[in-house]
A protein has these predicted regions:
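Secondary-structure end/capping motifs
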Residues: 115-199
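Conserved C-terminal helix/tail region of periplasmic/extracytoplasmic solute-binding proteins
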Residues: 187-221
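Residue-level signal for nonpolar/aromatic packing positions in well-ordered secondary structure
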Residues: 4, 17, 34, 63, ...
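Pocket-lining segment of extracytoplasmic ligand-binding domains
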Residues: 57-152
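Amphipathic, soluble alpha/beta structural segments
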Residues: 1, 155-161, 213-221
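Short, glycine-/small- and polar/acidic-enriched structural segments
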Residues: 1-55, 59-62, 69-75, 90-91, ...
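Short coil/loop linkers at secondary-structure junctions
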Residues: 39, 44-46, 152-154, 200-201
């Protein structure tokens, strides 16, 4: 759901951001996306641009006010930009870097809790897959319910458009991605980013902190 927006007509491409400030929230999906986008244009995120770290609402406010010429955000903050900055332009979004910059949402548990509560966690997985598949089977209705109950401040049309920027899979598709190692690979990509960005010397590999087996045991082929 991450996007890169600019307001300067002189900025035609990512490469044109060299030497400029870009507001975002570091350590988030928007930051991972921005790093990938800059490197795709042969820009060093640590040397060729100045990344301004702010909470996303503040980053968007800085962009709207003209304090910074670019912002890397996630939806639905793009709605604010489109409403308040007439000349704002989106020059790239995360879909351009999928699956190289794929970021998964999920849940984490302490090892002791995980070991002692596998039946409860299996029930959580089963409930999630049921809701996930029902949502995908009735996407428009699900979007309307979410907007009505959780995102009233976002117009329904904008909310539905925002939902299109995420990638969704059925439980059967997720099972394949878990089984063939794709999900672990996507997690490792994010680990690699934070190892560099956070100067982590010996990060725990995804294969050690991610266990796909409970999902595979719960969601049958």
């Amino acid at each position: 759901t991450a996007q890169l927006w600019v307001r300067d007509d002189a900025v035609k491409s990512i490469a044109d951001l060299k030497g400029k400030q870009i507001a975002t929230t570091t350590g988030t999906t928007a930051h991972v996306f921005l790093d990938r986008a800059l490197r795709s244009a042969r820009l060093d995120p640590t040397k060729d641009v100045q990344i301004v770290n702010q909470r996303m609402a503040e980053a968007v406010t800085s962009f709207v006010s003209g304090a910074v010429p670019a912002v890397a955000l996630w939806v639905p903050f793009d709605v604010t930009v489109k409403q308040k900055v007439a000349n704002a332009r989106k020059i790239v979004d995360a879909s351009a870097f999928f699956p190289e910059a794929a970021i998964m949402g999920g849940w984490a548990a302490r090892n002791d809790f995980y070991d002692a509560n596998k039946p409860a966690l299996a029930s959580l997985i089963a409930a999630w897959t049921e809701v996930n598949d029902a949502m995908l089977a009735n996407f428009d209705a699900a979007a309307e319910t979410l907007q009505k109950t959780q995102y009233k401040q976002v117009p329904l049309a904008d909310f539905k458009e925002s939902m299109k920027f995420s990638k969704y899979y059925t439980s059967a598709e997720w099972r394949k991605l878990y089984q063939d190692g794709t999900a672990t690979k996507w997690l490792q990509q994010v680990t690699d980013f934070f190892a560099v960005a956070g100067n982590i010397a010996s990060p725990v590999p995804a294969s050690k902190y991610f266990d796909p087996q409970l999902f595979l045991q719960t969601v049958k082929a």
